[in-house]
Regions:
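Sec-dependent N-terminal signal peptides
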Residues: 4-14
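Sec/Tat signal peptide C-region and signal peptidase I cleavage site
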Residues: 16-20
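Hydrophobic alpha-helical membrane segments
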Residues: 21-231
């Protein structure tokens, strides 16, 4: 399943003083509706994009599964993991800004990667050439869990997933299958240019105070020579 681009709209609301438990409750109720509104905008934008970009030339078919575990040498799975992680990060940050409790922000906000990606996976299941991918769902789940676990046990994100992209030579000879010879199109279609990283400070991860603050390590994974999902 190709990597889904999710549009994240971050709204900023001004804070105000709260003087009673009743006002706190009312504010949280209002903020919950604001949060749902933001989530609705994100999901609507994502599905609209996919419908126009991915499904416009595809035939609608009955619900079916699709096994793409080996597709794109697992770069796509890392893409799902990374997208879910980012969505969970934004969800948690929004709920904290809306004055939800730490547990509410952690478990509801931190689950946004899985919550937002799941409807899209079901949407895939009804189009020819796509399908419901169990491995995508596993990757989505792991992305959210990775955020929640770090926030729960470290109080911060000590291992940061990151993405780098550079244009590959394959897109120019793939007859449009890997993009239309421009940066944005190739970023969407050409997995040869992707490298996913796990970046961390050994001092923060291993709690060794003698290590310098500036020391940072990163482990990356990319793939090369791919002209199609299984080629």
């Amino acid at each position: 399943m190709r990597y889904k681009i999710i549009f994240c709209f971050i709204l900023f609301f001004s804070t105000q003083n709260i003087y009673s438990s009743d006002s706190i409750s009312r504010k949280i109720d209002r903020n919950f509706y604001k949060f749902l509104a933001v989530e609705g905008v994100v999901l609507t934008g994502a599905i609209s994009y996919l419908k126009n970009e991915w499904y416009s030339d595809k035939k609608r078919v009955p619900f079916h599964f699709y096994n793409d575990l080996k597709g794109w040498n697992q770069i796509d799975k890392l893409g799902h993991f990374y997208a879910a992680y980012l969505e969970s990060t934004v969800g948690y940050s929004l709920m904290k800004k809306f004055n939800f409790s730490e547990n509410q922000a952690l478990y509801l906000g931190g689950s946004q990667g899985l919550i937002l990606e799941t409807p899209i996976e079901f949407f895939d299941a009804y189009y020819e050439g796509w399908g419901f991918s169990v491995s995508d769902m596993v990757a989505n789940t792991l992305g959210s869990v990775f955020f929640i676990a770090q926030q729960k046990y470290f109080g911060e994100q000590v291992i940061m997933p990151k993405l780098s992209f550079s244009r590959s030579r394959y897109a120019r000879t793939a007859y449009g299958l890997l993009g239309k010879n421009n940066l944005l199109s190739e970023f969407v279609y050409d997995y040869n240019g992707y490298t996913y990283w796990f970046s961390f400070s050994p001092k923060n991860v291993f709690r060794i105070n003698k290590l310098p603050d500036w020391l940072n390590l990163a482990l990356g994974y990319g793939a090369d020579g791919m002209l199609g999902e299984f080629e």
